[in-house]
Structures are given as C-alpha cells and as structure tokens.
Amino acid sequence: MCIRDRVLFGFSQGAAMAIEVGLPRPLAGVIGCSGYPHPNWSLEHVPQAPTLLMHGSGDVVVPVAAQAALTAEISRVGGQVEVFTFSGGHTIPLEAVERAATFLAAL
C-alpha cells in the first residue's frame, strides 16, 4: 500500500492526531480543523506532507491561538502550511469543507 496518495483529515482531537502522526510521513496531505498541538509536541524535520489548518475564530473549546501555535511550529522547520480561519466556533462549516476540497484538488 502506498501512502503517498493518502490524506489525513481530523477535527479537534482527531486533528491533533492527524498532525502529529501525519506530518512525519510521506502523505499527499494533512488537514486539521480546530486542532491543537499536544503538550511538548515539536517537529524535528521538515514535514513531508502539505498541510491545511482550519479553525473558527470564535472557537471556545479549542481557541484559535492553537492554530497559530501549530502554524508557527510547522513554519519553523520549513513546512508547507496553509491557514484558513472562518467565522464561528468549534465546528466544520460548509466554507471549511469547500476550502478543504480546494486544497485536495490542488494536490
């Protein structure tokens, strides 16, 4: 099985897991919505997968600052990361689904 044609997509805790597990691997991409970095998480190498991080600006479950922390860490090691912030809270609105579809189409 080739994983280069696979994308991991996760929401909230699932996004945290997709990011942690997916970025070191040669995947086609990683998408995280309303995710956060696990405590003491850091990247040692440039992520192999292009990454899309999406987050609601009004998320009170996982504050949008978590997206900034993830973006900073991925950027620090030279990773390719796109950010999409939408109005709303801890959810996946249609506009985020559409943004994810655009990301996937470009892979």
Residue ranges and their predicted role:
Residues 1-5:
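Conserved small/polar residues in nucleotide/adenosyl-binding loops
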Residues 9-14, 18:
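Gly/Ala-rich beta-loop-alpha elbow adjacent to hydrolase catalytic centers
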Residues 21-22:
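Aromatic pocket-lining residues of Rossmann-like dinucleotide-binding sites
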Residues 26-37:
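A conserved short beta-strand
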Residues 37-48:
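Conserved serine/cysteine hydrolase catalytic core
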Residues 46-51, 77-80:
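Short, proline-enriched alpha-helix->beta-strand connector loops that line the catalytic pocket
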Residues 52-55, 59:
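Short beta-strand/loop motif that positions the catalytic acidic residue
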Residues 68-107:
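C-terminal catalytic histidine-bearing segment of alpha/beta-hydrolase fold enzymes
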